[in-house]
Amino acid sequence: MATVEDNKKLIADVLSTYPEKAAKKRAKHLGVYEEGEADCGVKSNKQSLPGVMTARGCAYAGSKGVVWGPIKDMVHISHGPVGCGYYSWSGRRNYYIGTTGVDSFGTMQFTSDFQERDIVFGGDKKLAKIIDEIEELFPLNGGVSVQSECPVGLIGDDIESVARTKSKETGKSVVPVRCEGFRGVSQSLGHHIANDMIRDWVFPTADKENAEKGFEGTPYDVAIIGDYNIGGDAWSSRILLEEIGLRVVAQWSGDGTLTEMKATPNVKLNLIHCYRSMNYISRHMEEKYGIPWLEYNFFGPSKIAASLREIASRFDEKIQAKAEEVIEKYRKQSEEIIAKYRPRLEGKTVMMMVGGLRPRHVVPAFKDLGMEIIGTGYEFAHGDDYKRTTGYVEDATLIYDDVTGYEFEEFVKELKPDLVAAGIKEKYVFQKMALPFRQMHSWDYSGPYHGYDGFAIFARDMDLALNSPTWGLIGTPWNK
């Protein structure tokens, strides 16, 4: 394995290709973790370098694609030209239960299809008409969110006024989300804006409804926050929480509903999976309603057991005892999976580059299989994400923030990992380099990966990726 000095030299060599000014900026985002440091030593949440290939998305992607889109009983309007909605259509595999087009709308695409005349004369009347049509065609919808695209912000349409008017007319929530793509430096601002709109447009109504109707709570009510049910992840997590005796009142946003969202201020504990995208609303609920929150990790049996114990520690001895029973229940299953796959995967090296939590959360699952992480990085992390990462990585691990296409390729060529785990933009680049690859945004059409049952699928998929006989038929460029 490369040493700290080796990786620092690698970074310097890669940066030497850039012009001096660009190299100086990118140097702040590349580093090597050294044991005992409080963070990973890289800058984050800064504007991408103009002219480079970045894997980041925009604020619209963060709001519509991540936070709001999976809420299944709402109709989410991509307000602007057709392209943004079209290219974000059903890309994340947010599974849900329901009848599409009747009471669930997750895989449908709604757009206001802005034309030149809408830019010139404004799109408020068109938006109002669309909401009327939605109410007529899909009367069982639970509400509407308006996900504004770049032109809406540039021309100054008053989507808030339309939302207030239509909400009064329909008696349903109409939530305007100012997530124009040009705002911020990545999809991360879109997450924040989406959280703020829940705070400002959903919770005030929820507080009133909860006060009028009442809520029959229990001491064991929890909410799953920031699990988008990719390939069924939230379901496999929910099973474990219910097995230890907790009642899951709501899950955001995968397979979630607006009704569940409104019920969340009544829970006893918010369990946050994707910290980066949902910590804002979790902190708000802690401040306003006094609801504590806890980040958990259900990737790999080691972390699952630790997380179950930490969650149970927030409740009474009954829940703590049940947590131990559940951990013991799945122990044999986990040991059999590890016994089957670890001999085939032991010592294999991995480089990751994903989004908001997986560059650290998935590490324990790899380690449970005897695999070694030699490089990891985030697309849109903030400083606190890199601080949280220190507990997952080993000394001399290469760390890269908002890594460019060129940098990532050069790092991989030099470090020669056995497996690259990143996104769809990187997948075919590295497969053409004859490197095993797993798409870690949507599990390469597999999953779930959360929970004990998910770990079995994860182990199988890593084995299939690394030990497929096809790799013996093609060579990597550096071996020619």
Swiss-Prot record:
Protein name as it appears in the record: Nitrogenase molybdenum-iron protein alpha chain
UniProt entry keywords in alphabetical sequence: ATP-binding, Iron, Iron-sulfur, Metal-binding, Molybdenum, Nitrogen fixation, Nucleotide-binding, Oxidoreductase
Essential cofactor(s): [8Fe-7S] cluster; [7Fe-Mo-9S-C-homocitryl] cluster
Keyword Electron transport included in the entry's annotation: no
Enzyme Commission designation: 1.18.6.1
NCBIfam families tied to this protein: N2-ase-Ialpha, nifD
Top-level EC class as recorded in UniProt: oxidoreductase
Binding site for [7Fe-Mo-9S-C-homocitryl] cluster: C274, H441
UniProt entry tagged with the keyword Nucleotide-binding: yes
Record GO biological process: nitrogen fixation
Note on cofactor: Binds 1 [8Fe-7S] cluster per heterodimer.
Gene Ontology terms: cellular component: molybdenum-iron nitrogenase complex
Catalytic activity from the UniProt record: N2 + 8 reduced [2Fe-2S]-[ferredoxin] + 16 ATP + 16 H2O = H2 + 8 oxidized [2Fe-2S]-[ferredoxin] + 2 NH4(+) + 16 ADP + 16 phosphate + 6 H(+)
Entries under Pfam families matching the protein: Oxidored_nitro
Residues bound to [8Fe-7S] cluster: C58, C84, C150
Subunit structure comment from the entry: Tetramer of two alpha and two beta chains. Forms complex with the iron protein (nitrogenase component 2).
InterPro entries found in the cross-reference section: Nase/OxRdtase_comp1, Nase_comp1_asu, Nase_comp1_CS, Nase_Mo-Fe_asu
Purpose of the protein: This molybdenum-iron protein is part of the nitrogenase complex that catalyzes the key enzymatic reactions in nitrogen fixation.
Species of provenance: Crocosphaera subtropica (strain ATCC 51142 / BH68) (Cyanothece sp. (strain ATCC 51142))
